[in-house]
Structures are given as C-alpha cells and as structure tokens.
UniProtKB/Swiss-Prot annotation:
GO CC list: mismatch repair complex
GO molecular function: ATP binding; ATP hydrolysis activity; ATP-dependent DNA damage sensor activity; mismatched DNA binding
Primary role: This protein is involved in the repair of mismatches in DNA. It is required for dam-dependent methyl-directed DNA mismatch repair. May act as a 'molecular matchmaker', a protein that promotes the formation of a stable complex between two or more DNA-binding proteins in an ATP-dependent manner without itself being part of a final effector complex.
GO terms, biological process: mismatch repair
Family designation: Belongs to the DNA mismatch repair MutL/HexB family.
SUPFAM superfamilies per UniProt: ATPase domain of HSP90 chaperone/DNA topoisomerase II/histidine kinase, DNA mismatch repair protein MutL, Ribosomal protein S5 domain 2-like
InterPro entries linked: DNA_mismatch_repair_CS, DNA_mismatch_repair_MutL, DNA_mismatch_S5_2-like, HATPase_C_sf, MutL/Mlh/PMS, MutL/Mlh/Pms-like, MutL_C, MutL_C_dimsub
UniProt protein name: DNA mismatch repair protein MutL
Pfam families: DNA_mis_repair, HATPase_c_3, MutL_C
Keyword terms, alphabetized: DNA damage, DNA repair
Length: 666
C-alpha cells in the first residue's frame, strides 16, 4: 500500500471546485443565488465565449461589509448558518460557503461591493486562490463580481469544456429558471455585448412564462393550487395542445429553488396521463412551498436534488391538485354540451333502503329475445320492470341466442355472465351523484318459445324502487347530423358543432366503469369456455407472482401449475371476447416496465387502459338510439373529454370558428 499523503490547501480547493463548479453555468448559478440571497431586485449577467472567458454579475443587493470581503473567499465561510441544525431550517439559496472559494481557486476573480451605510466600497482581486490585492473603491450599493479565464490553472478540466455555444445555451437555461422562480426580480442576460434575455420583475408569473417561452404558451395555461398544513403546491400547467415530445418545458421549484425530481415529475405526468397521447410530456411550472425541516437540500453538491420526509403524501397532493385543474378546464370547455341539468336522473338516494343480503333463491323471469328490448350488461338501460320486481346482487345469465345484432355496443355474446346489482356505486361510473336513466323495458308475459330465463339470486334483498323516467329536454336543442366514416359522430347543439370520436368515447366509458369496479371491489368476471394456458419465462412468472393480487382484483382468475405455467379461467366481463393470451402478456409487460413502488391505483389504471382498448369495436354504423346511449353514458363520467390514452373524445367548433375558416370574418 502506498503512503497516505495529506493534500495541500490549493489542491483540496481545486478538487472541491470540481464538485461545485462543473461548467460556466454553475458559476452563474452560484453567483446569482448569492445575489438573490442579498435581496437584489435587479441582476445583470454578462458573458463572453459562453462564460469561459468572462462572467460578470451585477446586482443591487445589500452588499458585503468591508470587514467581511476577505472572509467571503475562505472555504466554508457563510453568513447563512451557524451550526449543523441550521441546515435543516435553511430558507436561503446558498448555505455551505463553498461557492466563492471554489470559483476563485480555478479562475481570476475580481469583486467590488458596498453596503448602504458606507460611503465607499471594497475591491478584491484573487488569482488561482491567492489574493493579489484588497483596496477601497467607489461603487454603487450592491455587488459586482467578474470571473475570467475559468479553469485556466486546471488544464484537465479546461479541455473537457463544451463549445461556447453549448455553454451559452446552458447559461440561458439557468437564467430562465431564475426568471420563473423569482418573477419579482428583473434579470438581464448580455451575451457578447448584446442583450439575450430580459425580464421586468413585475411579480406576475404569467409575465415571466411569456418572457421565457412565448405568447402561445402563456395563453394556454391552467392555474392550479392546493394548500395543506405544511405544504402549498401551486403554479401553471399547460393545456394538452402545448405538450411536447421531451421534458424540456418542465420546471420544479421547491422553496423557490430549481430542482430535478423524478417523483414530482411522475406525479404531474400521471395526473396528465389520461389527457395526453403516448410519448407526449406536459408543460408545467410547479412551486412547492414547504417548511424547511420537512426537506433535505444537502444531498447533492449543486443542491439540484432534494429529499422529502413523506414522498407518498407529497405525490398525492401534487397529483390531486394537477388532476382536478385539468378536469375543471376541460369541463368548462364543454359546459354547453355536458349540461347535466338537462338530464332527468332518478333519485337513487331515496330508492335504496336496507343493505343487500346474500341468501339465494331461484326465480325465473322470462325475457323475449325477439323483442326490441335488449339487456344492457353495463348497467344503464333497464326500464318498466314488472311490478314488485327486485334488482338483486348477482344474476346468472346463460345466453341461448344472440340478443342483438353485431352493431350493438353493449351486448356480450355466448358467455356465462355474472351480472351486478343496478345500484352498485360502480354501475354508473365514478360519478356518485349521478345514476343512469331507466330506458329499455323487460317484458314478462310474452309466450314466445325463444325465452331466456334468468336465475335470480338474493331474493331476500331489500326492494329498490325504480322511478319511471320523465321526459327531459337534453335532446330538444340537439341535432344528430350523422356519422362520418363510421367513426365520427357529428352533432349540432346550441349553435356549436361537436365531433365525437365514437370509439374513443366508448373506450372511455368502458374504462371508467371497469376502473370503478376495480376500486369498489365489484369486478364482474366471465368464465371462459376453454381456459387459456400460458407458459411463462422465469422473469415473466416472477412479475406475475409479484402482481397476482392486482390481476385477481381486476377480474382475472388465474391458477398456476407446473413450474412457470399459468391457467387463465376467468377474465373481466367488460372485455367481451379478447385475445386472452395477448392481453395478459401486454398487461404483464406493462407492469414489468413500472417501478415496484408504483401504487396499486396506477397499476389498476394501466390494466383498465389495456383491457378496454381490447374491448372497443371499430367502424360501427350506429343507430340514432345507440348514439344517444353513448352520449348519456358520457354524461355521467367525471372526465368524458379524453380517452384513457389521452386522445380527445370530442372537439368543438363554434359558429365563429367556422366563419373564420371560411374567411367570412377576420
């Protein structure tokens, strides 16, 4: 073993500088943070050759007292803290006292500063960590610091610097982050003598966003905020139309400090998930104000990462705030179309009495298969039941013939079905306040030989009174124009044209129903006539074992036999007739790509998304009744505006929009 050497001060300072000062933009970041901590309201940054030749920062802050000028350049000399306990209560941008010492050890540094109570200031010049002079000077209140010839005395670092263009871009980026985090401060970036960036310190975050980005982005923002006991989350998220294919337009600020956080990014992106298309990333500027003792900023040399005491609670707070803001914005856009006051929903709160019991007794109810009445297996259309008929918890249905033609959205064919109680919360999606209308009738007295008999369980259940629908005025001012390419439904309402993607809309309806069934534990399954056997690899089998409860709660009945072989006996009813093996493997690979710490809710949503995609029919020629049915199903959803993959389910054109297209108006 070689002899252990004690490094000299110059060497240790250069090594320390390598941790704090990576490139010229690191110098700008550290010095601007010092200016902000000094209370500056106007900060000018001048650079030459991407900051490699010169970085000059001018501020109008409080300045440095003459007695402290020399001490400011000593390692770990700071005015921000006194002891280790202060680190966990820090509210300033800097606190370690490393920046000036590190910068001056690898450059030629000149600093001038004056405080308001002195008539003159002090000037100090340091070259390679050595003080060349310290003298009195005349200057304005505040601080001016010049850093030239960065890394001139560290050739190993100098040769790894990027191009001047690249470093200029990095400096512009960090200045833009400061503009966003401190809209009350005016920033001015001058590159090679020309103004590159200018903000005006109005204190309005939207003005800062417009300065950093452009008018289009600033006009397509959604404000959000959420305030808890120890944390406030607020800022702006971009509407789906300004999403990008990269995360460059995302900014996170914790106590005004720009940080990078994968879990905060994940919280925002998961909130956006059903509103954006695949591989699109949302625009957002998010601020998190939290008591300093609940975070640790001392986990990275550049303070670009933070740790939170309770990441799960933080995730939920951010997710809820962003998700509600997006839903509210989309809901506002389609207020005229989704005016639920026009729909006369029956009062289910008054119709439910005792809890449902689980005793069984078989009763046969005949249903005429040749009549125009159909069974809605998703639970929105049952009407004019025979007197004293009870809707009960589990109804086993064995189909004898097909119930409807191939264009029927809502009929399952040739499956053994387990049918849920009409008053389950899940039956009408996730909207607890709205229950579906009663439309179609089940007829009792038809003697036709094509009769389907239902085995009705839970005879001792409490009766549920069904009110017959009164006429409503939702369709009075709505005109169904028709379909285009058997894919898009054209509707006129209140002098506005709505175009609905029928497949995306149907997928959303199924998704919300399935997701709610999972959440409430009421998933309806169908038994496969022939169980599906799948041989898995060891890795695939381990993923299944890790998530087998997720599959079970989602309506899959899976047995294992052999070493890595599974047998799928039941799948969710909502799937219709899927390719079971392909669907199962798609879900498995989707779960594999998720992190193990992802919440079960996210995993269930992923399963529901894949499952409902497999259930949607394509290119159906819909009857007017089916179009109305689809619209009614959308009405009871909390978020009918986008499909589970983020594509819009509908778009709207006002009369003014169309007249602009045809140049009738300007």
């Amino acid at each position: 073993m070689r002899k252990i050497n004690l490094l000299d001060l110059e060497t240790t300072n250069k090594i320390a500088a390598g941790e704090v000062i990576e490139r010229p933009f690191s110098v700008v970041k550290e010095l601007v943070e010092n200016s902000i901590d000094a209370g500056a309201k106007n900060i000018t940054i001048e650079i030459e050759d991407g900051g490699q030749k010169l970085i000059k920062i001018i501020d109008d802050g409080e300045g440095i007292y003459p007695i402290d000028i020399k001490n400011a350049f000593l390692p770990h000399a700071t005015s921000k803290i006194n002891s280790i306990e202060d680190i966990y209560k820090i509210s300033t941008m800097g606190f370690r006292g490393e920046a000036l010492a590190s910068i001056s050890s690898v450059s030629k540094t000149k600093l001038k500063s004056r405080v308001d109570s002195y008539n003159f200031g002090k000037e100090i010049y340091i070259e390679g960590g050595k003080i060349e002079y310290l003298k009195d000077t005349g200057c304005n209140v505040g601080t001016t610091i010049e850093v030239s010839d960065l890394f001139y005395n560290v050739p190993a670092r100098l040769k790894f610097l990027k191009s001047a263009r690249s470093d200029s871009s990095s400096i512009s980026d960090i200045v833009n982050r400061f503009i966003l985090s401190h809209p009350d401060i005016s920033f001015n970036l001058i590159n090679k003598g020309k103004q590159s960036i200018k903000s005006y310190g109005t204190g309005n975050l939207k003005d800062s966003i417009r300065c950093v980005y452009n008018k289009t982005i600033s006009e397509n923002l959604i404000n959000f905020e959420s305030h808890k006991d120890i944390i406030s989350v607020y800022g702006f998220i971009g509407k789906p139309e300004i999403s990008r294919k990269s995360r460059t337009n995302q900014s996170i600020f914790v106590n005004k400090r720009y940080v990078k956080s994968k879990f905060i990014t994940a919280a925002v992106e998961n909130a956006f998930k059903s509103f954006l298309t695949v591989n699109s990333y949302p625009f957002f500027v998010i601020f998190i104000d939290i008591f300093p003792e609940y975070i640790d900023v001392n986990v990275h040399p550049t303070k670009s990462e933070v740790k939170f005491k309770d990441e799960r609670a933080m995730f939920k707070t951010i997710f809820d705030a962003v998700h509600e803001a997006i839903k509210g914005e989309l809901k506002e856009s389609f207020t005229n179309f989704f005016n639920k006051e026009d729909i006369n929903i029956y009062d289910s709160e008054k119709s439910i009495t005792e809890p449902i019991k689980l005793e069984k007794e078989e009763v046969q109810i005949p249903i005429d298969l040749n009549s125009n009445n159909k069974i809605d297996i998703f639970g929105n259309n049952i009407n004019k039941l025979p007197n004293n008929t009870e809707l009960l918890k589990n109804i086993g249905i064995k189909e004898k013939n097909t119930l409807e033609n191939n264009n029927d959205f809502y009929t399952s064919k040739q499956n053994e079905i387990y049918y849920a109680n009409k008053n389950d919360e899940c039956l009408n999606s996730c909207n607890k306040d709205n229950y579906s209308k009663i439309e179609k009738s089940l007829q009792k007295d038809n003697k036709n030989p094509d009769i389907l008999y239902l085995n009705e369980h839970n005879r001792n259940s409490s009766p549920i009174n069904i009110k017959e629908n009164k006429s409503n005025n939702f369709y009075v001012d709505m005109k169904i124009i028709g379909q285009f390419n058997n894919t898009y439904i054209l509707i006129e309402k209140d002098k506005e044209l709505y175009i609905i993607d029928q497949h995306a809309a149907h997928e959303k309806v199924l998704f919300e129903k399935f997701k709610c069934e999972i959440e409430k534990g009421y998933v309806i399954s169908q038994i496969l006539l022939s169980p599906v056997v799948i041989e898995l690899s060891e890795d695939e089998f381990n993923i299944y074992e890790e998530n087998k409860d997720i599959f079970k709660n989602s309506g899959f009945s899976v047995e294992t036999f052999g070493e890595y072989t599974i047998n799928i006996k039941e799948v969710p009813l909502i799937l219709g007739k899927p390719n079971v093996e392909n669907l199962f493997m798609d879900i498995l690979y989707n779960l594999k790509n998720m992190k193990s710490k992802e919440t079960s809710t996210i995993k269930y949503n992923a399963i529901a998304t894949l499952a409902c995609k497999s259930a949607v029919k394509a290119n159906d020629n819909l009857k007017e009744e089916e179009i109305k049915k689809l619209i009614e199903d959308m009405l009871i959803l909390n978020n009918p505006y986008t499909c589970p993959h983020g594509r819009p389910t509908m778009i709207k054109f006002t009369l003014k929009d169309l007249e602009k297209k045809f140049k009738r108006i300007q």
